[in-house]
UniProtKB/Swiss-Prot annotation:
Gene field: fixC
PANTHER family documented for this protein: ELECTRON TRANSFER FLAVOPROTEIN-QUINONE OXIDOREDUCTASE YDIS-RELATED (PTHR43624), PROTEIN FIXC (PTHR43624:SF1)
Pfam families found in the cross-reference section: FAD_binding_3
Protein name from the UniProt record: Protein FixC
Gene3D superfamilies: FAD/NAD(P)-binding domain (3.50.50.60)
Entry keyword annotation includes Transport: yes
Annotated GO biological process: carnitine metabolic process
InterPro entries assigned to the protein according to its UniProt record, in alphabetical order: FAD-bd (IPR002938), FAD/NAD-bd_sf (IPR036188), FixC-like (IPR039651)
Keywords for the protein's UniProt record, in alphabetical order: Electron transport, FAD, Flavoprotein, Oxidoreductase, Transport
Signal peptide range in chain numbering: none
Cofactor(s), names only, from the UniProt record: FAD
Domain of life: Bacteria
Family indicated by similarity: Belongs to the ETF-QO/FixC family.
Role according to the record: Could be part of an electron transfer system required for anaerobic carnitine reduction.
Length: 428
């Protein structure tokens, strides 16, 4: 293998890496994907929601054959205190186009399927091998060193996940700071398909996506999530790494208390724990973006920090897919001119500007806005308090709605309400 020179070596068989391999192989490029896990997706952890638009135009109708779990039609956003919750519920009963849909997925299944599509197109995959170093010649990346073997390529695409050591060694990425990432933990809880559908009011392959703010992370930056799969639930939480030193609870204890919350416990009652996983999640958006392009090298997916936590929804997989496609298109263009210089590969950033970077730039101030203790303590308590007063009738004299809101608003502080409101308008 060391005698071959590939058009591209891709480090990592996640979504970005697999899509890059697929798009390249379809055009006849010689592609090698190196995955340190025993299979594609073996090392990947996600809450579990894939927005279909970025993959739909690469593999039209992919959901008909891919191992997607459920079509998300129900959205829930809950503000939680220790014992109560105020939930907003949206049900989409309208017919949507394939590119407007989203699905719950299990990465171990989905990533393996996607990599199979790339292999069928001609890409090569080796697993269980770690890339230790990138090979450079005259300042240009010309291959990788893996398991003591040097494998050469005209380009290398780094899709090796958040905190890419290889990108750091190249000087293209800085060491990840605690403020840039969060710790995510997830349990996969097995329940009968019919039970899931009854509890979440689903029909057929419909699914629900639920996000929770407040008590799941003990009032710290982050939140809980729950996604319905075919016969399992993906339940977990994410907490900003830089806040953990202030935490009164460990992350496992946060998760256990979240599971016992009155709004959550009935949903998972009787379920069987079949999997536990933990992962570091990029949270800083475009503010943690590395240098995306070098001589002979590109960075994509989580390795490039391509994740967006908007509070009401979380995006990462669709951005990774778009980045993988953009990287592949850039390499194909470079192959035509036999120019793999940094200047030529800069086309990659141009492709990204019409997708991931455009979206990430729009919300670049959001991470700092959300890194506000009131967002995960004061405001959930405000929402729950107003809801409690609204629905409580005890025979005492009635109180106007505005007075209920003002009374609870005092706890947050009216100056804080005004400041946060004005800042929210500029950010969102």
């Amino acid at each position: 293998m060391s005698e071959d020179i590939f058009d591209a070596i891709i480090v990592g068989a996640g979504l970005a890496g697999s899509v890059a391999a697929l798009v390249l192989a379809r055009e006849g490029a010689q592609v090698l994907v190196i995955e340190r896990g025993n299979s594609a997706g073996a090392k990947n952890v996600t809450g579990g929601r894939l927005y279909a638009h970025s993959l739909e135009h690469i593999i039209p109708g992919f959901a008909d054959s891919a191992p997607v779990e459920r079509l998300i039609t129900h959205e829930k956003l809950a503000f939680m205190t220790e014992k109560s919750a105020m939930t907003m519920d949206y049900c989409n009963g309208d017919e949507t186009s394939p590119s407007q849909r989203s699905y719950s997925v299990l990465r171990s299944k989905f990533d393996a399927w996607l990599m199979e599509q790339a292999e069928e197109a001609g890409a090569q995959l080796i697993t269980g091998i770690r890339v230790d170093n990138l090979v450079q010649r005259d300042g240009k990346v010309v291959g990788v060193e893996a398991d003591g073997d040097v494998i050469e390529a005209k380009t290398v695409i780094l899709a090796d996940g958040v905190n890419s050591i290889l990108a750091e060694k190249l000087g293209m990425a800085k060491r990840v700071k605690p403020t840039d990432v969060a710790v995510g933990v997830k349990e996969l809880i097995e329940l009968p398909k019919s039970v899931i559908e009854d509890r979440f009011q689903l029909q057929g392959n419909q699914g629900a996506a639920c996000l929770f703010a407040g008590s799941p992370t003990d009032g710290l930056m982050g939140g809980g999530f729950l996604y319905t799969n075919e016969n399992t639930l993906s339940l977990g939480l994410v907490c900003g790494l830089h806040h953990l030193h202030d935490a009164k609870k460990s992350v496992p204890q946060m998760l256990e208390d979240f599971k016992q919350h009155p709004a959550v416990a009935p949903l998972i009652a009787g379920g069987k724990l079949v999997e536990y996983s933990a992962h570091v999640v990029p949270e800083a958006g475009i503010n943690m973006l590395p240098e995306l392009v070098g001589d002979g090298v590109l960075i994509a997916g989580d390795a490039a920090g391509m994740c967006m936590n908007l509070g009401f929804t979380i995006r990462g997989m669709d951005l990774a897919i778009a980045a993988g496609e953009a990287a592949a298109k850039t390499v194909l263009s470079a192959m035509k001119s036999d120019d793999f210089s940094k200047q030529k590969l800069a086309e990659y950033r141009q492709h990204l500007e019409s997708g991931p970077l455009r979206d990430m730039r729009m919300y670049q101030k959001l991470p700092a806005f959300l890194d506000n203790p009131r967002m995960f303590s004061g405001y959930p308590e405000l929402a729950v308090g107003v809801a409690r007063d609204l629905f409580t009738i005890d025979g005492s004299a009635p109180e106007l709605m505005r007075k209920k809101i003002l009374r609870h608003g005092k706890k947050v502080g009216f100056i804080n309400l005004i400041k946060d409101g004005m800042k929210g308008v500029t950010v969102l």
